[in-house]
Amino acid sequence: MRQPLPTAEALAWFKPFIPQSKENRAAVRTAISAVAAVLLAFALHLDKPYWSGMTTVILANIYTGSIIDKAIMRIAGTLAGAWGGYFLAGYIANSFLLYLLSAFLLVTIAVYYYNFSVYAYAYLLGAISAFIVIADLAIAPEQAFWVAVWRPIEIGLGVLVSAAAAFCLFPINIHEALDKEVGQVFTGFQQLIRAVQDNLLLRHSAVDELRKNMQAFKKSVVKATDMLGYMRREVGFKREKIDQLRVLFDSIYSLNRSLHFFISSQQYASIQAELKTTDLPLAEVFSAIIEDLDCIKCHFLKQTDDGKELNSTQALHSLDAALSVLTARNSQHQQAVFAISHLLRQLVNKLQSLQLVLVKGQKFTAPHARLISRKQRLQTDPDIIKHSIKAGLSVILALCFWLISNWPGGLNGLISSIVISIRKSIYEMKNISLYRLLGCLTGGGLALCSLAWIRMDLYDLIIILLFGVWVFSYFSFKYTAYAYIGLQANIALIITLAQAGGPPIALDPPLERLGGILIGITSTFLVANALWRSDTLTQLTGRLHKLSRYLHYNVRQLLAPEPQKKPLYDLTSLFWFCRGLLETLEQEGLPPKKLSVFEEAKQDFQNQVLLQATITHVYEYINQDKCRLAAARAGWDLRALEAEVAALFEEKQVNLKPGQVKKQLEALRDALLVAAEEENVSADDMENSVVYLGSLMQLAIIAEVMARNNQWVDDVNQEQAAAGV
């Protein structure tokens, strides 16, 4: 009788040898794919097999979708760049001036598009591939055609191996990891709701601490949203899930912004004090919202539907009934109750939309937003143009140094000038240069020590390459802040060991690459310090000044008459960039003079965050036309007051009187409350009007604060201009 195979026992025996953590599994996958790519390149007798191995470690990532997305752009950029460089080489081969000019234009244009294109990596690889073909004209012009042919083949082999390994060898799918992220997003937002409730009703936590928690939560939502872009490259899930997750993350992000606006408003302290003396079922509404979040999460993850209505809907109806009784009896606390009811209504409405999309499966149609996108804004940004020109000049200087020094084989290292110069500040350039050197020395050192102690054959090469790439890849995945060191160590190791024909017989490749890296670093820092120098603090003050101009423009357009309105700027990326600069400067030891400028910059940034929150709140949640009609019925011209608020944000401010504007807005609010009692205006209309007038008052207060504090920007700019910075 045939005995069944002991499958379970065999799997149990192998289990200790199967990597468990996702970092270790990805590292093992990377090591095996690198060795496989190098061996295939040997078998196919490719001229430079290390390009195949390098491609696998450059594409390495924990998640399958990220690898495939990057692989597509790498092969597309390489093909376009290599053949574009070859055809361009035919026109410039006899002119040194055209040789330098073409290299400059290639890098400048590529870096320009790298700054805002969704295909940034493809543009960068295209420039690097074309640069390699063109730069080699000075040394071996007869090789241009073969470089254009074989380089894409060598890189394409690495791409195919990486893609196959990503799908077949320990695949880690983003859509599986995102289920965990979804749970964390729901849990994190529930904790924020509880914290806001405790702070508002019981004052258990400080507002500053609450803001920090909201900022940390916002980062986690952005991280989860970024993962969605790679999910479309994977298999095993419905495409509709991407749309659902995007709606979820966008909605939670928007609600987090509403909470931040509410607790950061100038009226928050008075709202707290007024609510303390009112008897409203606010705790019940908050509890219902938290329960509904948990219910939506469970149904979405399990793909079930119990058909029940949200608890928060009924809780909000009870609150509205209590508000009607309170406002009819006493109008003293109407500002506070309208503010909190407006916030809770936003939360409940968003939850209803999420239930329809995530649980009921309805398609979500996003409202059309007339915004000037990040791409449109950056296309004409002078800083982006300057940055691109500096990158092109860095490459030209590195190329000249290389030609003068006649350093053999250092062309691959010269790519450092491109990779380093795409960084936005000198601080980042210093870090990336140091990491590049450390990685080169570590990986090259391991290879050279192996060659010194072992008489290497093919089997030795496989073992050393497998072990080395695994260690460096695991380091990269585990310690993401220093991932670039591990990547460069892998590249140096592969370049040293994977030479044409088999195991290495010379020590030139790592030394040539090290020399090229030093040339690239030197050239980049010379250009960065000599032309449009931008240390981190200077860059921060400049970006804050630019952010202020964009925000002032947005306020003026938001309050402009409807026929004259223009699209607002989407400033999300600029805010994140400024926040990154602030976090970088907090880690640096600044001298006292710069420290005072930095503290002023932090305060100015906080004002701009509040201004942006106010603009977004009015843009997304307020019906301005209804407010104007309500004011007209009370005998007021709200457009005139809006024009006065907008005038506070004009570039040339004359006779600024924010205090008077604020008093007029308060008088209008009081008049509307009186008119509401006499004319029986609906609670929704009054809520809309009172909250809008509160937002206009907040804009007036912010204008006054920024007018006092922004003088330091002009002072700093004048000092820097006088110093020739």
Task: Please place each PLM-identified region on the residue numbering.
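A transmembrane helix-and-boundary motif of multi-pass membrane transporters/channels
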Residues: 1-233, 240, 337, 341, ...
